[in-house]
Amino acid sequence: MNYKEIMNSEYYYATYSRIAEIKKDYPVDHAFLHIRHVVTYAKKLAKIFKLSKHQQKLLYIACTLHDIGYLDGRENHAKSGSERAEIYLTKLNKLPKKDIEVIVSAIANHGGKEVLDFSEPVSMCLAIADKLDFVGSRYKNTNPKYDCSNYKKIVKNEFVLKDNKIQLTIFVKNGFNIEEFNTSHFGIKLKKFLDLLSL
């Protein structure tokens, strides 16, 4: 079993279609586009951190399932998602129990709120890949309640491992306001995450 099989499954389509519907008025995509972005970032991170082929397989499966907990709401979606993933993967009966445990642990810890969340390579790479997805294309919402104009000016980001630290470069369009970004909900969350990662 691999992540492409999951992405082509009825379960994946139905689950993320429902999440897209639930979060349609929310300014950030947590469905198909986000999952594709997270898998792409994870592939780069897997090379940077030299994950084995087996670890890569588990990482990409975790990426495809990491936000399924949004079916139960935003709060504790990582825990809920890990429980849903365990049920789904166990039912498929295509992976050994120890592999399912690695995937489920990565999903449970993808919030990256504690240093321990980075103790296992698959968990670490999923948490980082998830946080790196703040590019403008993810902000599709037109709900007037949210102003996403500054976020939409983020074109892409690139990252490398330098001196045992991730160096993040953000490419933006003219008019991007870094102060506004740094004091926004996501900017503050990203800074806390990067600070934790550098401990």
What is each model feature region?
Residues 136-199:
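Terminal helices and disordered tails flanking the catalytic cores of nucleotide-processing hydrolases
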Residues 1-76:
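Acidic/His-rich, divalent-metal-binding segments that scaffold phosphate/diphosphate chemistry
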Residues 1-17, 130, 179-199:
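Conserved, charge-rich beta-strand/loop surface module that forms ligand/interface-binding patches
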Residues 49-160:
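Divalent metal-dependent catalytic cores for phosphoryl transfer on phosphate-bearing substrates
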